[in-house]
Structure formats: C-alpha cells, structure tokens
Amino acid sequence: MGGMSGLRRVYLARPRGFCAGVVMAIEAVERWAEALKEKGELVVYHEIVHNRVVVERLQAKGVHFVEDLAEVERLRRERRLADTVVFSAHGHPPAVRRQAAEMGLTVLDATCPLVTKVHTEAKRYAKEGYWILLIGDSADHQEIKGTYGEAPERTILVAVHTHVGKDPRLADPRTVEVPDPERVVVLTQTTLSVDDTLATIAILKKRFPKLVVPSRKDLCYATQNRQEAVKRIAPKVEAFLVLTSPHSSNGMRLLELAQSLVGRAYRLERPEELRPEWLEGVESLGITSAASTPEDLVQGVVDRLKAQNPGLEVVEEGAWETIAFREPKPLSPEEVLKGA
C-alpha cells in the first residue's frame, strides 16, 4: 500500500461496533452451536447479523444459515442437524415462527428486544383499529418484513423521506393515503437515521394531525448513540472510514451521515480494503463501525494506519455503552405456536 505520510491523528468513535442486541445474538449462536454439537449442527434463519465476517466465522464453526426454512429439509438429507433453529436479531413475521413449530423445531429467538417492542406495538395498535404507517428504507429489510408481518392488513409501508422513490413498495410520506385519517399511528424501523426519521414523522404529522407518535425510544439507542458519536467527531476530521456491510441499515446510515458532515467518507468491511487514495491530504481521520462489525476489524485498520504512519496519534473519543440483553431461552414447538 502506498504512503499515507500526511496522516497525524485518528479519532475512534465511541460507541462503535457491537451493540447489546448483536452481542446477545452472536453469543447465543456460539453457545448453542457448542452445546448441541453432539446432536448435530445448528441452523440460523437469516444472517444472524448483517456482517459477512461474522457469518463466515460462524459457518467455520459448523453453523448453517438459511433464508427459507424449507432449506432445512434439504440440509437434513446432507448433514446431521440439531432440531433447533435460531432466529436472527432482526425479527421475523409470525408465519415463519409457525412454520418452525410445524417442522418440530426448537426455537431460539435472538430478536433484539427493541425490535420485539415495535412488533408488540404493531399488534396492539392493529387490534385497536389503527392504521399503521411503518417507516423504513427498504421493503426487503428483514426488520420491515417482520414488523409488517404482525399486521399486514392494517400496515402501509412508508419511505423515510431521504429514500422516496428508491423502492416503489414504500409510499411517499407527502402523499400517502390511509382509509381512516382519524386513527393512524406511525412505527419505524429501529436502525434508520434519527434526524431523517424525525423529519419523516414531521411530514406525516402535517398530513395527519391526529397521528399517534409512540416514544422516540422506538429508535434504537445504539443507532442514536453511534450517530451522535459521528457528529461529535466530524468537526475535528477531514475524512471518515465506516466499517460496515452494505446490507447493514444502521451502518449505511452512519456512512451517509459522515458523508453529509465531512464530505469524504468511505465504506470498507475488512482492513485489507483500505485504499491509500482515500487518505490523500488527510491529517485527521475519523473511524466508526456498524453495530454488527467486530472490533478486531477496526483494530486491524488502525494497525495498518500505524504501520504506514509512524507516530500516529490514536484518540478514543466518547464513552462505551453498558447495556446488556439476556440470552434467549429455547422454546418448544408448542410454546412457539402459543406465542405465534
């Protein structure tokens, strides 16, 4: 790699990387893959978190990832599987839970508790006769699929205002229609830009004065904290590196935020993707990472920068989070059906 001799200081954003929901989900997969290895290999429905490195490391431990539970039958013919499936951190529609139970699978539901809270609200408001406007960035995002699946007949997908037109399945907040404007509530994907979500809610509130807006706490604390950390560092740096998968919604929002504040912001997933031209003319650099990015990848980038820039000053900026979530308990097929 070419010289990066102009770089003098790196600011590492705190918090960055794994949030409590991701830690809980990954630890659950690792622990149960080990605990069940005598019975067979573990299956996870959907990527446990949206990070290729995490998925590859778990695959190396014999964990299988499927996008359709029907794939479990095929895998059973080829491999010795444990009769257990882990649901990823993003949440899933009731139909998937029922399917797992009907297949006789024990379920470990590693859905983030903050996502579960939004699911609970969707069910409650639908039962009370409200129309739900669900703000998201893509109808294909697993979290949107899961929340929508709780009340599909009363939910309308709405694009966060910065993504209008990018996915035709998401309505424009400025023109969206609901059958009863007197009974309408807004819910949101938890990993969006805080500022963009609040701006979208403001647009909807103008359109529907009776709009019910649940607590701002529905926006994930980790998403908010990581965005605030980028805002704090931005005035001190000339460029930003964001370690994230392109499939991580919270990571891509960090990248967009850094680009809007600094102008020069670059995405990478692994240290070896670092490119010298990104840092030409840069003396101060900010680094952050998505809530599903392992910390050793960040440190790998820092090590490369130090090797290229002797005397490089590395500043940890901000505070770490202290929140932790309890690991899920296994649910029998009967217990899953009761709650589906």
Swiss-Prot record:
It catalyses: isopentenyl diphosphate + 2 oxidized [2Fe-2S]-[ferredoxin] + H2O = (2E)-4-hydroxy-3-methylbut-2-enyl diphosphate + 2 reduced [2Fe-2S]-[ferredoxin] + 2 H(+); dimethylallyl diphosphate + 2 oxidized [2Fe-2S]-[ferredoxin] + H2O = (2E)-4-hydroxy-3-methylbut-2-enyl diphosphate + 2 reduced [2Fe-2S]-[ferredoxin] + 2 H(+). This is 4-hydroxy-3-methylbut-2-enyl diphosphate reductase. It comes from Thermus thermophilus (strain ATCC 27634 / DSM 579 / HB8). Binds 1 [4Fe-4S] cluster per subunit. One of its GO terms (molecular function) is metal ion binding. Belongs to the IspH family. Isopentenyl diphosphate binds at residues 50, 90, 141, 248-250, 292. The gene is ispH. Dimethylallyl diphosphate binds at residues 50, 90, 141, 248-250, 292. Its EC number is 1.17.7.4. Gene3D superfamilies: 3.40.50.11270, 4-hydroxy-3-methylbut-2-enyl diphosphate reductase, catalytic domain.
